[in-house]
Structures are given as structure tokens and as C-alpha cells.
Regions:
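Bacterial N-terminal signal peptides that target proteins for export
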Residues: 2-20
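C-terminal motif of bacterial Sec signal peptides marking the signal peptidase cleavage site
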Residues: 27-30
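Bacterial signal peptide processing site
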Residues: 32-34
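Extended, compositionally biased repeat/scaffold regions that form elongated interaction surfaces
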Residues: 36-154, 191
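Structural detector for short beta-strands of small beta-barrel domains
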Residues: 148-169
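OB-fold (S1/OB) nucleic-acid-binding surfaces
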Residues: 164-180
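Short nucleic-acid-contacting surface segments enriched for D/E, G, S/T with interspersed K/R
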Residues: 185-201
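OB-fold/S1-family single-stranded nucleic acid-binding modules
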Residues: 206-230
Length: 230
């Protein structure tokens, strides 16, 4: 799977209607529960539309999740933020960053009923249909289930700046050398030769191995959430 293109964006609904086909090898690792999981985790996956990066923080009564979707072609990365109180979804906030930016914010009350709804395209307010709200809600729950499996399977997202010697300075300040397949390393090197700055890379690590997810000129670390800020 050539999951390495620079991030892009498509209209929000086209992504949320898309299939959630996980990278097979990585999903196979996400099959057993582990009660020792840390409260703040980062994971992700690639499907036939693009790459999804997931940051998540669990507390005793809340789950907070941020996803970044980077389509393989045509556009820029879009983000989605979710909150659950217990198992009840309380917030959906979606942003697509393009020439016609789109923003969606939906809140649900303690009884899981819709309590607030906002939809803007290029700063102009538009209506959301009940079907659209239901779709966003359905996709949120699917992503929660996917995140559960990836966390339990120890599928970990790592990001940082690539160096000529094959090492990466991660967003946490560590210097590591990802154990990537040769084609992935060669692709990064090709991208680096056409860039005036060190490229950013995102990759997944799991018990079964590592997989390159994204390569881009942008600095992923400038906006990657941290446990303290999330």
C-alpha cells in the first residue's frame, strides 16, 4: 500500500460516507484488550481514500479524540474533534481547510438528543439535515470503535522530521530510526531530493512491524497535540 502521499482534503460528507477499510496487517494486531493502556495515545490507519491519524485522551468519565484525514489526492488535510461522556457522544466538530473552508459543530445533551448545530461554508451559515447529523454521528461511533481496536492492539503513530542518515527527530524530541521497508525509505529519499527543507514523515508501529503513512513538506509537529494541551 503506497500510503505516503502529502495530505489532501475532500468535502466532508464524501469522506464520512467512505469505507473504513483498515490496513490489514496493522488491524490484525488490534485484537486483544490491554488494561494498562496510557491515557493519551496516538494511532492511525490507511484506507483506499487516504490516511487517518488519531490522537486520543481517556479519563475516568470522558474520551476526547482528534482525527486528521489526509486524502491521497486533491486538497488539504481535514480534522475532526469528538468528545464522549462515558459512552454517550457529546460533541462533533469538523473542519476542512480549502479555498472554500467548511466547519460543522454539533452538540448532544445528556439524553443524547441534539442540542446545538452549526454549519458554515466560507463563513456563510447553512442548514444541516437530520440525515447529515445522523451520518456524522454514525461515523463518529465507527471511528471510536476503530480507535479502541488500534489502541488495544498497540498500533502507535509517530511523526517527525526526516534526516539524510535515515533517522527522524520525532515531535517529542527523540532521535529514532524507523524500521521501514526499502520502498518506503526510497520514497522518502525521492521526496527529500525535491524539497528545500527536511520533509516530515508519519508512520505506524505495531507488534507486526512498521508502515509508512505520510510524507509532506509541512511540519507535522507544529500542530500535533500533546497530552498536556489536549
Amino acid at each position: 500500500m503506497n500510503s505516503f502521499n502529502e495530505g489532501a482534503a475532500t468535502p466532508l460528507l464524501s469522506f464520512w460516507r467512505g469505507p473504513l477499510a483498515l490496513a490489514g496487517v496493522l488491524l490484525l494486531s488490534a485484537c486483544s484488550h490491554d488494561s494498562s493502556l496510557p491515557p493519551f495515545t496516538a494511532s492511525g490507519y490507511a484506507d483506499n481514500q487516504g490516511a487517518v491519524r488519531i490522537w486520543r485522551k481517556d479519563s475516568s468519565d470522558e474520551v476526547h479524540m482528534l482525527t486528521a484525514f489526509s486524502p491521497w489526492h486533491n486538497g488539504n488535510t481535514s480534522t475532526a474533534e469528538y468528545r464522549w461522556q462515558g459512552d454517550a457522544l457529546s460533541l462533533i466538530e469538523l473542519n476542512i481547510y480549502s479555498k472554500t473552508p467548511e466547519h460543522v459543530k454539533v452538540r448532544f445533551d445528556d439524553h443524547s438528543e441534539l442540542s446545538f448545530m452549526q454549519h458554515e461554508v466560507s463563513g456563510l451559515k447553512q442548514q444541516l439535515s437530520s440525515d447529515q447529523v445522523a451520518l456524522y454521528r454514525y461515523r463518529a461511533e465507527q471511528l471510536r470503535q476503530t480507535s479502541d481496536a488500534l489502541r488495544q492492539g498497540r498500533v502507535v503513530l509517530r511523526q517527525g522530521r526526516w534526516h539524510a542518515d535515515g533517522t527522524v527527530t520525532t515531535c517529542e524530541g527523540q532521535t529514532v530510526k524507523p524500521e521501514l521497508e526499502s520502498w518506503a525509505t526510497e520514497h522518502i529519499q525521492r521526496r527529500q531530493r525535491h524539497s528545500s527543507v527536511e520533509v516530515s514523515v508519519a508512520w505506524l508501529e505495531a507488534p507486526e512491524g512498521s508502515q509508512l503513512l505520510l510524507v509532506a513538506n509541512e511540519d507535522f509537529c507544529t500542530w500535533q497535540p500533546t497530552e498536556k494541551s489536549f
